Amino acid sequence: MINNVGIDIVENKRIKLKEEFIVKVLSANEIKTFNIKNKKQKREFLAGRWAIKEAIIKTLDQPISMNKIDIEYINDKPVIKNQELQNILISISHEKKYAVGIALKQCDNK
């Protein structure tokens, strides 16, 4: 059962490739992936992470820093690596100008 939904969309050109913004949004693992991309890919990657992390935060009862949320792809699907956020399903989508993220928080059923 879905407990909460978060969604966010961002225009890629609004994303700035500045170090202080990058470390605010990306986890240490994500920064490694980010660093091997070209400039266009970096902007799209960062926009996607911004959108999905905003969506995740919207589902939570307590605030969390974006860079504490660690996302990676497993079998071509985005997955939250944080144990405490395992009950949140996510999807990231990219279009020429935009990135969108949606997060579905599932009930614990306890």
Curated annotation (Swiss-Prot):
Q: Which domain of life is it from?
A: Bacteria
Top enzyme class, one word, equals transferase
- EC number, as in UniProt: 2.7.8.7
Using the record for this protein, list the coiled-coil segments as residue ranges, or answer none. none
Q: Name one Pfam family in it.
A: ACPS
Q: Which reaction does it catalyse?
A: apo-[ACP] + CoA = holo-[ACP] + adenosine 3',5'-bisphosphate + H(+)
Family matches, as Gene3D superfamilies: 4'-phosphopantetheinyl transferase domain
Tell me the cofactors it needs: Mg(2+)
Q: Which molecular function GO terms apply here?
A: holo-[acyl-carrier-protein] synthase activity; magnesium ion binding
Disulphide bridges, residue numbers: none
Which InterPro entries does the protein's record reference? 4-PPantetheinyl_Trfase_dom, 4-PPantetheinyl_Trfase_dom_sf, ACPS, Ppantetheine-prot_Trfase_dom
Q: Fetch the SUPFAM superfamilies from UniProt.
A: 4'-phosphopantetheinyl transferase
Similarity comment text for this entry: Belongs to the P-Pant transferase superfamily. AcpS family.
- Describe the task this protein carries out: Transfers the 4'-phosphopantetheine moiety from coenzyme A to a Ser of acyl-carrier-protein.
Q: What's the protein here called?
A: Holo-[acyl-carrier-protein] synthase
What's the source species for this entry? Mycoplasma capricolum subsp. capricolum (strain California kid / ATCC 27343 / NCTC 10154)
Lineage, uppermost ranks: Bacteria, Bacillati, Mycoplasmatota, Mollicutes, Mycoplasmataceae
